[in-house]
Amino acid sequence: AMAVSHVIFKEFHYDHPDPYFTEYCRSPTDFPVLVMMEPREDGHFTAGRTVRACDLGYKAPECNNPEWKTVVWDELSDKPAVAQGSMGYRWGQKEGQDLGKWNLHEVDGETGKAIKPQLTFLKDSDAVIDVDYPYFGGRKRDGFPNNPMNSEVMVRKVPVGKIQVEAKDLYVATVFDLFGSYLGVDRGLGGECAKSYADNIPFTPAWQG
């Protein structure tokens, strides 16, 4: 399944983007949701939690459930937005607040403005960072083949944006960009990624085969 994901991402989201695939991933999935990148002492990063409305300054009771409303990057305004449809809009709906906002309409639920969630920072990133992912494929398990690598940590290049949270600059990545980097798809950023399907890099067809 991982190799299938690698091929689909490479061929239909990077090499030859398919409008149907792109629209589907951009609207009714969590691929555009922003994730905080947590710095490590060695200069690398790990994926932290999702960015929430409360990180943008929204507070209860003026904002209902701000800790449960996820954030995307809006292509139209070129800044973060609180897209409707996350769990924070499901509970405690009230007239004049969140009533009728638990849906996938492309609207910022807090401002009422139209938005277009951005899938990737690949073409307009503030930086490209090294992100560490755990690798478990080298461990021996009964009934399953293993494929040891040089390390149990995979380092991948990820394009990121920058936001301010409590007066601090933080790097954020979309779930889409994190997933693509995790799969080892070469998107022109360098680093440890597969140049072809024949490379023994997690998670290519050669690696899985």
Where are these regions (language model features)?
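Long, well-ordered, tryptophan-enriched scaffold segments
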Residues: 1-208
